[in-house]
Amino acid sequence: MQDSIEQYMQAVGQQARKASRVLSSASTHTKNNALSAIYTALVNHEPEILAANAVDMQKGRDSHLDSALLDRLELTPTRFKGMLQGLKDVIALTDPIGEITDLAYRPSGIQLGKMRVPLGVIGMIYESRPNVTLEAASLALKSGNAIILRGGSEALQSNKAIATAIQHGLKVAGLPEHAIQVIETADRAAVGQLITMTEYVDVIVPRGGKSLIERISNEARIPVIKHLDGNCHVFIDVEADLHKALPIALNAKTHRYGVCNAMETLLVHEEIAEEFLPRIAELYAEKHVELRGCQETRRILGSSVKTATEEDWYTEYLAPILAIKVVEHIDQAIEHINKYGSHHTDAIVTENYSKVRKFLAEVDSSSVMINASTRFADGFEYGLGAEIGISTDKIHARGPVGLEGLTSQKWIVFGDGQIRH
Amino acid sequence: MQDSIEQYMQAVGQQARKASRVLSSASTHTKNNALSAIYTALVNHEPEILAANAVDMQKGRDSHLDSALLDRLELTPTRFKGMLQGLKDVIALTDPIGEITDLAYRPSGIQLGKMRVPLGVIGMIYESRPNVTLEAASLALKSGNAIILRGGSEALQSNKAIATAIQHGLKVAGLPEHAIQVIETADRAAVGQLITMTEYVDVIVPRGGKSLIERISNEARIPVIKHLDGNCHVFIDVEADLHKALPIALNAKTHRYGVCNAMETLLVHEEIAEEFLPRIAELYAEKHVELRGCQETRRILGSSVKTATEEDWYTEYLAPILAIKVVEHIDQAIEHINKYGSHHTDAIVTENYSKVRKFLAEVDSSSVMINASTRFADGFEYGLGAEIGISTDKIHARGPVGLEGLTSQKWIVFGDGQIRH
């Protein structure tokens, strides 16, 4: 079995590599044609796709998947419409491939510039949500990359049905069918193969729980664009405008709980804590947010607030729970963020110019915000179109990753016969 | 021993991480001050450094190091001057850190942009040449990164002497001495530690032979900016201007042999081969370049030309040897380059507009050149100032890597109290 999985994955890899060569020089027109044909095929195949999803859902219920997972797995007609809209958005995006920038003459007489090119073959590993299949496939196609998709086994029928529509679209546009491949085995060995086929795969994008991503990062022999966790902070400075601070602190925590850009720890300057904390606590109480505070927070808000432990500062709750710490000054806030945070998204609320500059320069996170809710850190809000993930790495892509994160730049040189002396 | 190496390296890593936090927000003025102080210290320490190098050289001769290695190891007064000039060049470079680009308003009212930041801690692994110690240290410092340097054991005394001058310079400028650390053990286990300390090191830059780099890439748990090999091509199209083609083909092969951007295979369009090959062969003969040709090449040039085997197409000779293949058309040339090449640097010589566009779009190499010698692919010629390496990867940095390759961009958001709806 192990052998046959290896053979299967090697074949998938070879086909992807071959298809990627065609895709890399496909015109914008051809790629958009394929995406439009996929759109039409999806509309035509909607009943089959929803039926396949119903099979996955029934199997999921039979095997007692937890309700959050079942929720993510489900494709309703509304979600299906959302998927189609996402696809339309990708068609509307500017094709990044072939863009030439920075063309300038060097003293030798050569003219040097950079040209944007696809990475090649993307390996995508994800859990449950079948809409990721379409999102990832369309972003890969638009950016001239081939993609190998490995969704969760619980979504296999849904993903296969979506893949059928995608294949149909590729065929209509005359692009190789292996440009987008869905792994059709539930065997976990397939993932082990995918993340080590260095000759066939150029980058791995995992999406899912922290344990999945950690496992993949540890075992991959291929660069991984990974998103570990989002332990985000908002720091309310003594010079904060409370008309901004209160809505931001409320929005960053309560707009949605289960998302990576939600605030998990609130930091408050000690000279504003007496005024700010009781007012924000009242707003959190209305939303039933559980507060866990440092000693000073509990002195101000009362001992009904639980004590935050060292562990709390590290925790991404993804729930209506918030840790609160009173700090002496901005340096302590920055130190806390850089030490306990996950380098995802952190914000300061202040009117002070020099503190803005300090916070921007010293907070080591993929998004650093001034007087705005951390909830803005996402591909749509950043105008990237669809988002293939949010990277907490520093190498290659950082923060929300859209089309450009799936590309690279090569150097180009225009000469007139120059030789090196 | 293994334990103590681990403890030693962990301490080195922790200190580097700590120093990197200071460096990341050091001003351009402070960093340049430190570099100038290092310059002065090097000038003052020249006798000690050359004496230390003499010790390494003697030891090298005693242990029968080969002459190429001894040559790379040697620090002559002329080479020392070259090192100092390189340092001056780095001081003159624009500081990339803190650069803010693409600031634009989003529909939500937030203003979004990107800010250039250091990667953090660089691990540099290299062989013999002690000037790399200064080059890498100065580039890291200028770009706000801490660096851990692990040179070859044969250069240990030279590297320690250079490091002493560097430490002195850091001290004068008030920067942490651990910003630049030289590993002082010859134990190979130190490398194993360095490339797996994911919490303390952000990127590994290996420089050396292919086997060293392959070993490091395979074992590293940290992203590697690697340069495997340079199997470069020049394709002489039927529409080539021979006044350009002859000098380029000669220069790309014979300007220097032991460099990664030298041409290793010459591809010639069949309709120009009869005219071009005898003329270029004459020029190569003057330089005593050994030719290995395909069947058609040997038909034209005579059977004194050796037969090129499949193996030859893959080979980076780094020597006065050249493989030659006659191809039917540009597609065959591109296919050959993408299949056998190392995606380093490849050139076409042609006057045809559409072939230029095709070659640029379809050749998958870090540098793609039109009517210019492949020898131009280097950090100095590209105006990057010093070069920390040439990357044959697509992720993060591609081609010659200078200061910018040691940086990353974070997103920054300026708001006025915006929350997400």
Curated annotation (Swiss-Prot), chains A, B:
One of its GO terms (biological process) is L-proline biosynthetic process. The keyword Amino-acid biosynthesis applies. Pathway: Amino-acid biosynthesis; L-proline biosynthesis; L-glutamate 5-semialdehyde from L-glutamate: step 2/2. Catalyzes the NADPH-dependent reduction of L-glutamate 5-phosphate into L-glutamate 5-semialdehyde and phosphate. The product spontaneously undergoes cyclization to form 1-pyrroline-5-carboxylate. NCBIfam families: PRK00197.1, proA. HAMAP family: ProA. This is Gamma-glutamyl phosphate reductase. The gene is proA.
